[in-house]
Amino acid sequence: MDSGITPHMPMTRDLLFDLGGVIVDIRRENCVEAFRRLGFADIADYLGDYGQRGVFLALEQGAVSPEQWRAQVRRHLPAGVTDGQIDDVFNAFITGIPLERLQALRRLRAEGYRTFVISNTNPVMWHGPILRAFAAEGRDINAYFDGVVTSFEAGCCKPDERIFRLCIERFGLDPAATTFFDDSEANCRAAAAMGFRTIHVPPSSSFLDFI
């Protein structure tokens, strides 16, 4: 999508980032294969490239707790599978964050941009591999962002306008002065409809290619 953005982003004050596929590297196939090895044969029906289904979506929306999610996942698995095994195969979705992206986020803040996250994610990944990935430089996520909104605490997922509205209200965003980065075209369209400047980050790219 055409954002009108230049390398120095003169008309942009705030930057709103998706995580997976934009900052955090993800590999759906790692997760699918790991679940299949554990015995969840039809896992691909629940995990999409840009959204989840069934109890996985419910976890992402905060409608079920991690404990309730694991209990429902166990219905698809052989007896004896532990909580740790379930979490480990699910977390295989996340492969890490290249250090240059973390460094770029700190540089953007040092240059005066406010940086924010709006992410469709779940508490299992968030409190596990995602926050660990942000600790790679010995800092925590607050070193990189001025604020975070996750779908599981918002109770809704992109492209629902409610999660964008929550970001606007919580952080005092002016959509016309905010550039939104996402790997989902549907999410970019939803943000553009609310007045945000948008950049679609295609597969095998990152936000670094657009700043």
What positions do the PLM features span?
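Conserved phosphate-coupling serine/threonine residues in phosphotransfer and NTP-handling enzymes
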Residues: 119
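Structured helix-beta-strand junction loops
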Residues: 111-112, 144
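Proline-centered loop/turn at the N-terminus of a beta-strand
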Residues: 114-116, 197
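Asp-based, Mg2+/Mn2+-dependent phosphohydrolase catalytic module
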Residues: 2-17, 122-123, 127-211
